[in-house]
Structures are given as structure tokens and as C-alpha cells.
Amino acid sequence: MSANHSQQLIDAPRFASLTPLIEPRSVAVIGASSDPTRIGGRPIAYMLRHGYAGQILPVNPNRAEIQGLPAFASVAELPQAPDAAIVAVPAPQVLETVRALGRQGARSAIVFSSGFSEVGEAGAAMQDAVVAAAREYGMRLLGPNALGAFNSNLGYYAFFSTSLERGVPLPGRVGIATQSGAYGAHLLGMARERRLGTPICVATGNEADVTLGDSIGWLVESPEIDVVMAYAESIRNVDSFLAALEAAHRAGKPVILHKVGRSALGSRAALSHTASLAGDDKVLDAVLGDYAVIRARTTEELMDIAYLATRRIYPVGNSLGMITVSGGAGIIVSDVAEEVGLPMPPMPDMAQERLKARLSFASPINPVDCTAQALNDLTLVRDFTESMVVDGGYRSLLAFFTQAGTAASIGARLAEQFRRIKEAHPERLFVVSVMGEGEELAPYEEAGFALFEDPTRAVVAIQAMGRFGEAFARPLRLRRPAGGLQLPASTPGEAEAKRLLARAGIESAAEAVLGSAEEAVAFAEGIGYPVVLKLASADIQHKSEIGGVLLGVSDADAVRAGFQLLLRRAAEKAPQARLNGVLVARQLQGGVECFMGIQRDPLFGPVALFGLGGIFVEVLQDVVFRRCPFEVDEAEAMIRSIRGAPLLFGARGRPRADVAALARLLSNLSRFAWEAGERLRSVDLNPVIALPEGQGAWAVDAVLEVEEVADGARS
């Protein structure tokens, strides 16, 4: 391969560079086998059986022919440079094989071989060498330790799973990207049973080069794929992952992610409350919320959401109307809809009256129960459903007709009634819950209905379609490069931290650090009582733990006594701490205590946290997360999303808090964290007091942790 061609491949868009790997015109198989049951033989057998039209080039020094194809003794003897090369040789031979492929001009390699980073340091070093060789020649490399990739639209199977013995993927427009090859094969089998077409799959293995993000990105940019299912155990390359999610949002293509595993952020964050609340799993959820990605809780949910997403109807302002022949099913669906946050508003009063006039013993509220009488007169189904669309205005409709919906006596006629309404309102999402097999379901499938036996699973999937719709309607906000804000060389004390935050628009109540009791009295007299007294020391982060905070100090004598008490407590309980004096601050009266903070996630950078203070944050962990930076409207959405939000909005006769000021403060904090760069480890504002509307929101306590630098260097 020429140096110029190699550079062209490297400079190509990251996702497009996977095309030779997923849509190859020729495939070499290094370590090819005549035995179609062996790892080096299965891909050849699968491609021959399923009509791969490109060239298959087996390489084996001991065979002149493999499975009816001419074989080559070495990579150097290949008659052409393959688009893709399957590497199925022992681990010690992989490096030289990849180098030989590079010299031959191969554009990509799929390394089945194991024995690399998954087995320890020696394997990791060998893997690094393999990747370096691939990059030297501009090759993309899948694996090592990868099950491979397939594109059944081409009959291409660089995939050694036995699952293909049970059948190839059905035609369709759902792609699979998975870090686990075996689990990806399991998804393939489940999709076949669900009659869900998954023609393209990439299993990334060790992700030495090609990542999960690369694979998702290629799939969402493919004109042959509308929906992506992804399975992840960890996010190994955040840049490619986020680039893929941005591509999915631009393309209007849903990504459903099944991310497993739980872990903590790391010991460096132990300084603040923030550290015990944040975790990379919660942070990931917050990041996914910025994009058109839904996280599935189970494999079944992954399948359900992907299946319904293939209808490509993503309602904005989603609401659910249900027509049913079972009042019990209506109750069950209503419960689940409330649990997942899918609105089921009642039908308008006038529409209810018209439906009652048509069938006096019907329940026309929502769910609309047309009773078993509908089986005698199918025009009831038509009229009731039409009213739900036109009068009720529901964006999504769920029809529950159980086994009656596929009965030989009425199934086809019922499907026809629904088909007419669906065709008259193509922008609405229609789902049918019936039981049946094969031909019994055909009238509904031919009309394009999504079918669910379990209506509760349908509700979860319908709710997901609305979340996709809202995400696609919301423009992505691009983040400019971070950095530029100067931080102190080491973790500052509270007063300095507050001064730094104040310059970013994060205000505190009037306060000062004083060196004597009389100075403290003079300042307190000036700002008015009551006041708060705190030890001022960068070495004592959580002062209340040693009795270093005094509240409700109400006169000059109390200030003098409190000043001396704090100094004694510091000497007794923190004798090594460096004291700057005592901080005197105005004590805010009333309001709602809140918590907000920043934690630097090792993958996604600064993440903001918000919740109510006290028991809400410490015990209930009613906290929301969002990746920084964000605007005021997004901050207000965070505030509204916590379970305790009614306390801020005037619940039980309380005065409404100044939520607008609280949102501005939270947004300012997010921008501060973004501009501060990588040296900012965490910020802990606890409490923040949100005073009644129009009176502002103020940071009462502030802990700011920075990564120390030598010789006073600044960021």
C-alpha cells in the first residue's frame, strides 16, 4: 500500500473507514479451514451457503483448496488486496499476519484470535503492537478476541458463531453493535424469534481499534439501518461514543443501549458529598439524556423498543389512548403508564357523552372500554377509536383485544377496521395487543401494526417512542473547548472558594473572614443578626463534623463567645489545621435548602448534581445529574425532575421558591466547571438556600477541590 493511500484512509471520516470491514468486496481468511465447523472454516461455509458475491480468498500453507475454493499459501501470494481479512491464527502469529496484510494493501482486519489484553500485561503489550502495525498501514482492526461482523444484505459473514446454524438474520433495518460477541449472537437469535430484522452486526471484542462508538456511528450513517441496538459493558472510548450519539441525533435514528455493570467514580472524589452520590452509571444516564438514546433495563425491553422504533413514528408531546374489551387490562396499563411517566388524559366530556349515547354501558374515559359488545358490532370499535384520535388527540393508541383479536370469526374484520383508521392518521402510533400465531397475526402485520402480547411491555415501548420524539425535536447544544479559567495552585478555603465562585455568578450571603472577636462583632453589627460563625480553614473541609459551625448567633456577646469557642474546638479536634480566622456570614431566614455540586467524571468530564438538602440528598439520594455546561432552561428542567420538586413550587401552602434564581445559579456553576478545566476535581455547595420568589438563591457553604500543581503554577 502506498503511503498516500494509507494517509487517505486515516484521514477519512472515522465511521466511513469501517466500510471495508462491514461492506467488503473481497474477504481473505487467514487460518482458513476445510472443516466448516471450525473457527477458520465457519465464515467461509456461511458465505458460500448464503451467496456472498465478493471474492473469498482462503489462506492456508497446507491446503491448495478449501471448501471448493482455491487456497493461497501465504498473505503475500494473494492475487489482490482484500477489503477485509479474517485473522484466525494463534495469538503469537497475529502481529506478523497483520503486518503482511498491511504490506499487501488490506483495508481492514477482523481478529478472532484471543490471548491479548484480556489475559494480562503480556497480552496487552502484544495487542498494542498489533494495533500499531495496523495503523502504520492505515488499516482498521476489529478485535482482537472478537466474534466478528456480518452483513446479511451481502451474504457476508466474518462471524464464527454457531447461532447462524439456526438461521441467518431476517431482512430488516435494525443494526446491532455489541461488546460481547456471544451476547450479540443471543440478540440475533431473540430477534429472529421476534421477527425483527437485524441484517448487520458488529461485535467489537477487545476494542483495540474499532470501538463500540465507531460501530454505532457507522450503523447510524448507513442508509440501510434505521434503528441501532447496542450492548455495552463499559465505554472504552468516550470520543467515538459521543460522536456516534451526535451522528444518531443528526440522522434522527434511535439508539437503544443495554449498558450493564455498576461502579464508583473513584477514590479521588472522596472529599465531598458529591463523591458518594455520583457514579459513572448515573453519569452515563445523564449523558444519554442529552442525545436520542434510551437505556434498556433488560434484553426484552431492548427488543421491544427496537421493534416499535422500526415504525419510525416518534410522537412529540406523547400521550396514550387505550381502547379495550377488558376493564382489567385497562387498569393494568394505566398503572404502568403512570409508573413510566406516559400521560393518559381522559377523553373530553362531550366525546364521552357521544360514546355513552352509542353504548350506554361503555366506559369512555380512557382507557375506553367498549366491552364485549364490540365483538357483536365492530363498527363500535371503529367509531370509538376514531373518536379517540380526533376528539382525544392521543399521539399513541393501544388496542387490547387479546385472543378475540385473532379469532377466525372476527380477526380479519377487526384488523380491517383498525387499518382504515391507521391509514387516515399516519402520524399516530398504533399498537395492537393480541394473542395468536402465524397466519392469525398476518392481517395486522400486513397492515403495519406493531404487535405485543403483553400490553404492559407495549406501554414501556410507546413511552420510549415519545422520548425519542422529544430528543429529536431538541437541537443538540455543541460544547466549545473547555479551559481558560484560572484556578488557585491548591485547594482553597471556603472564603477564597466563594470569591472565585462569585466571579462566575454563584453568589453567597454577605460574609467576611475576621481575625479577632471584636472585628467579628463589628461586621455582624453591620450586616444584621442573626449570623453564622464558621472556622475559616482550607484544611477543614466539613466543619460541622468538629463543631466548627455555629448557627443563629443573635447578638454581640454571642459573637464574642462563639468566636472563642470555635478556636478552642479547632485546637482540640484539628490541631494541625491552618486557621485564617472565623468566617461571619448573614444567616438566611426561611427558604428551601438545596444541594448542588460538580464531580469530574473520568470519561465525561464535569457533571453537575442537584437535589434538595438534608434527608433528600443524604438518605433518599433524590439527586439528578447533567453533563456540563448547560443553559438556564436545562437547569430548570433538572430542578423540576427531582421527586421533591413540589417543595420548591409551593406545595402545602409554602411560599414558592425563587426557582428562576436557583436555575441561574446551577447553570452558572455548570459553566464555571467547564471553564475551570481538568484541574477542578469537585465543587460542593451544601446548602444552597432558595429564598421565596424574587429574593434569590444563595450558596451558604462551599467546598472546592482542585488538583494541586507545583511551584504555584496556575491553570
Task: Cite the ranges covered by each PLM segment.
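Catalytic-core regions of core metabolic enzymes
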Residues: 1-715
